[in-house]
Amino acid sequence: MKKILELISEEVVKAFEEAGYRADFAKVTLSNRPDLCEYQCNGALAAAKTYKKAPIMIANDVVAKLTESSIFSEVQAVNPGFVNLKLSGTYLADYLKEMQADENLSIEKAAHPKKIILDYGGPNVAKPLHVGHLRSAIIGESIKRLGRFMGHEMIGDVHLGDWGLQMGLIITELHERKPDLVYFDDSYTGEYPEEPPFTISELEEIYPTASGRSKEDEAYKEAAMQATYQLQHGHRGYQGILKHILDVSVTDLKKNYERLDVSFDLWKGESDAQPYIPDMVQYLKDNGYAYVDDGALVVDVREDTDTKEIPPCMILKSDGASLYNTTDLATIIERMKLYHPDEILYVVDKRQELHFIQCFRCAKKAKLVDEDTKLTFLGFGTMNGRDGKPFKTRDGGVMRLENLIKEINEEMYRKIMENHETDPEEARKTAQIVGLSAIKYGDLSNQASKDYVFDVDRFTSFEGNTGPYILYTIVRIKSILTRCQAEGGSLQDVSIQVPNGESEKALMLALSRFNAVMENAFEELAPHKICAYIYELANDFNHFYHEVKILSEENEEKKKGYLALLLLTRDVLESCIHVLGFTSPERM
């Protein structure tokens, strides 16, 4: 289904051409003065120079052609040369009827679907998820869902941090605590136990203890580095411990991501890319891409157009050790080999931009990816507390994600119990649903690249630009529809009608923009545009709700029109919140 702006533009292009002017001047936009009109065209102002004519004369010529169009109810030429447009109520109602009959609600699925690997999440194993992991998970999940909604094949990969010194530290500390474990017996050749030698709680305590000791005890650090080296070079017992670390961590991570309604198609980690590193290093050397500089192996990635210095991409340190660059490039090779994606999209902290510029340029220069494979970096800003500094616990520590979710759910529960007489058990369930909307909408309503303040009071409010306000609006619609059926009404033979008043038309105009908003949000990887849209849509619905008596309307046709409009508004809002990554309760 074509976007409504396209259909309006086609009509205006035709009028410009019939009036003897070029089509490229016929650009139509949403009106920036909705009190005067709904859409506008300022092309006459630009055309005046070309045609050596006063803009208002050109505007009048175009308007003369447009008055014959059935799309518009009102067309005006306004000084100095604006063309103001108002849509016909009949045309708008017909457009929404077609939209309501379309199973995709007017969304045109991609004609040439792309396969896109989405790298988001990125937690380290053996450590609990904390608030710093929130943005990548929420933004990545939303873009994955949006891509699928638009018809693309989206593959989400958590890309675990499961390699490097942290593993050696855990092995060393475990060896000190439980030296008799078979994993440390080099003569042992049997099967290793299926039961892990630690719980997630023990694992989360082992790592910080080991990390702290390594900073004070040089011999301990040396032992950890040696254990890391042995693990990376195939030590059988250490590989067995790594498997347990992954099993225990991933089980816990899945549980925590589930609370956020975030899921991944792939649970791969840095360790999965390791087998690709030796051949990649050899290839980069053999083909002259990599050279030795001060003992390290590097690839030059400067470009003539650079406005700031981009250092070479280091592949191996002078001691032969690999780095994040090495692992990320090997992961790109693995992804190209196994999945052949059209695009790999990284949802990562914006402070890592230089790292990804280096990796992407190296991958392109060394032909590790096809020429037309797109490598995209979506950098996000920091989630801060009210003091403008990164969000912390009250005593200044890093807040665990599960504690943040608990805190938000408690606040939502308190507000629900305060405002309504309701069953405590049901209120708890509702608080979880609404709490998730508070967290996700609070994050996604900000442009991804911007830092933002996580304000618990504001995000959990039922008023203003918040998740709970959006859900409250959806529940209000559901309750009207439920009441209609309880009173013996039917929702089967309803149909959108020509609008009767300004608030109804405003709601219909907002609904008609749904497909354009979703398409634009995907093109720009901008979930915040969906948030802005549904906030406007919720406001338009609530104005309509307060002005119109829906269920007590005596004119049966009008009432059916209102109910059809409610059904479409509910469906559009629910489609949007699904893409944003949360759901609505039945009652609030």
Residues covered by each model-derived region:
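Non-catalytic interaction-recognition regions
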Residues: 1-93, 107-588
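A short, compositionally biased domain-edge/stem linker segment
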Residues: 101-106
